Amino acid sequence: SSEATVDLTVNPVNDAPTLDDLADASVAEDSSYTLELSGADIDGDALTFLASVDANGSVSVDGSTLTITPADDYNGDITVSVIASDGQASGSGSFTLTVTPVNDAPVIGTLDDQAIDEDTSLTVELSASDIDSNDLTYSATNGDSEIVVDGTTLTITPPANYNGSEVVTVTVTDGDLSDSTTFTLTVNPVNDAPTL
């Protein structure tokens, strides 16, 4: 028998990188979430990370730092997809970012300055918006006038024979947070009949 020597050359083949496991996470409404990404490449290639979100937010990647910014006032789940690439092949993964709700302050509607005659009352309809759809309660304060708030209806009755100007402060609250506005009430003088 005879022997022969054969040279066998094993050509390198690029192996796809792997992305380290991504755990679900949570963040408060109107806050950003940051995560350091990591992966491995058996060939020792440098990795580039890419990411995308399904909706209700934006995403950016700076090196291996992933930052997700939910849309303003959004709460709920965001699906985040991540890719680790060596320029030829890639590995991917995803996780769910849960955005937990945070109470937002109501916003009261502006009120125009008002004028009434002496010895009369003023009635004004109040309005406000609350993105959280909470129940809203109104209140008002000023000088010596009598103030009654019934639902969204404000009634102001100045003292008898009073004339002049006063600032009225109106506040709306959702039970936790509040917003206020002011307007000026001018009470015009009215001639009173003399008494004998």
What are these regions (language model features)?
Residues S1-V13, A23-D104, D112-D192:
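Acidic, turn/loop-rich segments in luminal/extracellular domains of secretory-pathway
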Residues T18-L22, I108-T110, L196:
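PAS/LOV and related PAS-like sensory modules
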